[in-house]
From Swiss-Prot:
This is S-protein homolog 7. It is found in: Secreted. Residues 1-20 form the signal peptide. GO terms for biological process: rejection of self pollen. PANTHER family: PTHR31232, S-PROTEIN HOMOLOG-RELATED. Keywords: Secreted, Self-incompatibility, Signal. One of its GO terms (cellular component) is extracellular region. Disulfide bonds: none annotated.
Amino acid sequence: MNNLFVLVIIIVLSAGSNNGSKLFPKNQLYFRNSFNRNYDILTVHCKSDKDDLGIHTVARSYVYFFKFGDSIFGDTEIVCTLNHGVSATKYKVTFTAYKESRFVIRFGAIKIWEARDDGIYLTDEDHDAVKMYGW
């Protein structure tokens, strides 16, 4: 019985760690620049309560992505700001790109955020591309 308890504790701690594995794959967020004009650069800035991932520029047809794990406390939330255009403040949207379920730790979740001329679209395991935000 003690061995089973130790095994359960190790699995729970592994689930909350920052080290990904095949048993507990990391979640992934992708940001794709699908604007029609080559010169239209997408700027992505994501952060959580614990980390600021910095500002990244994404050229047309390219992707920026990162991996992360859910917290065992159910508090993983990643907020991102996407902007583009000559005046970056004109076309700017801030939104929650990922929010952990309070009762389920997810492993290997993939969310693809695609910036298009008319707005920001989400593709994930639940549905194909759906427009979530307008510019």
